[in-house]
């Protein structure tokens, strides 16, 4: 698929894709994913052609932008590394996020409280989100999926070849997809205008690590306050003032001077 010149992959975006290890695929290759393999390293890891990854991101964004009601787009991620990304994507584009376990019957059983009728489904991993893809096939909902080289492509209409197991890779793909959708909708003025949202916002963060860092920061501040208080007491300690006139006592220096006379 050839893109217009204005949609070409920029060097900055290519560097981001490489830095996030989007190009590192699995060692096994599913037959439908062979066209996306650039080459195979000596250790067996398949390198994904990021040019084709970008083409599929643009295609997926054009499909998403064509849906009149943005809430009719459902984004799913049972994989932990993709849950933060789909929530941020939904917040920026107006899509409906399904983060965590996909409840069976979400798309097929209208009796359930979580029943939805989306016009488009986007999943992070065809393996972990297999239930969402299966139900989409029952009700004829097109599916866009982030696929690794060994991912099954059954019932997937648009596959975005990438490393769908790394937290940085998953977050960056969702960020690029959201940015492209906003560009097509005209929310971002033109392709030369940078998006104010950083890719880091889409990266998975461990809640325990965040809590531990916050605790360490608080403990560090408390230690610094104690040390500062001790230093202030040591260097600015007040001395008791003595009024020699009222006490009737004379300093030792004056006594010595008087004895010489």
Curated annotation (Swiss-Prot):
Record keywords: Acetylation, Cytoplasm, Ribonucleoprotein, Ribosomal protein
Subcellular localization: Cytoplasm
Annotated region (Disordered), positions in chain: 230-261
GO biological process: ribosomal small subunit assembly; translation
GO CC annotation: cytosolic small ribosomal subunit
Cytoplasm keyword on record: yes
One GO MF term: structural constituent of ribosome
Gene3D superfamilies attached to this UniProt entry: Glucose-6-phosphate isomerase like protein, domain 1 (3.40.50.10490)
Compositional bias annotation for Acidic residues: 230-244
Chief place of localization: cytoplasm
Alphabetized Pfam families for the sequence: Ribosomal_S2
Source taxon at top rank: Eukaryota
InterPro entries, per database record: Ribosomal_uS2, Ribosomal_uS2_CS, Ribosomal_uS2_euk, Ribosomal_uS2_euk/arc, Ribosomal_uS2_flav_dom_sf
Modified residues annotated as N-acetylserine in this record: 2
HAMAP family xref list: Ribosomal_S2_euk
Family to which the UniProt record says this protein belongs: Belongs to the universal ribosomal protein uS2 family.
Task of the protein: Required for the assembly and/or stability of the 40S ribosomal subunit. Required for the processing of the 20S rRNA-precursor to mature 18S rRNA in a late step of the maturation of 40S ribosomal subunits.
Record text on subunit structure and interactions: Component of the small ribosomal subunit. Mature ribosomes consist of a small (40S) and a large (60S) subunit. The 40S subunit contains about 33 different proteins and 1 molecule of RNA (18S). The 60S subunit contains about 49 different proteins and 3 molecules of RNA (25S, 5.8S and 5S). Interacts with RPS21.
Name of the protein in its database record: Small ribosomal subunit protein uS2
Gene (UniProt): RPS0
């Amino acid at each position: 698929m050839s893109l217009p010149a204005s949609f070409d992959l920029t060097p900055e975006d290519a560097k981001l894709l490489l830095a996030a290890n989007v190009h590192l695929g699995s060692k096994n290759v599913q037959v439908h994913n062979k066209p996306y393999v650039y080459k195979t390293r000596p250790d067996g890891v398949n390198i994904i052609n990021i040019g084709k990854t970008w083409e599929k991101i643009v295609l997926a964004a054009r499909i998403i932008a064509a849906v009149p009601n943005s809430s009719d787009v459902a984004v799913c991620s049972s994989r932990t590394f993709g849950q933060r990304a789909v929530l941020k994507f939904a917040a920026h584009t107006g899509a409906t996020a399904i983060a965590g376990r996909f409840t069976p019957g979400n798309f097929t059983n209208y009796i359930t409280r979580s029943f939805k009728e989306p016009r488009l489904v986007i999943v992070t991993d065809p393996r972990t989100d297999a239930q969402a893809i299966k139900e989409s096939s029952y009700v004829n909902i097109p599916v866009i999926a982030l696929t690794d080289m060994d991912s099954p492509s059954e019932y997937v209409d648009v596959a975005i070849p990438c490393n769908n197991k790394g937290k940085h890779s998953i977050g960056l793909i969702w960020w690029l997809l959201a940015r492209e959708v906003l560009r097509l909708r005209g929310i971002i003025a033109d392709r030369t205008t940078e998006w104010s949202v950083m890719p880091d916002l889409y990266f998975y963060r461990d809640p325990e690590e965040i809590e531990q860092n916050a605790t360490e920061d608080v403990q560090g501040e408390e230690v610094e306050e104690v040390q500062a208080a001790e230093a202030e007491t040591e260097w600015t300690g007040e001395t008791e003032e003595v009024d020699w006139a009222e006490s009737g006592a004379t300093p030792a220096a004056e006594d010595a001077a008087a004895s010489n006379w």
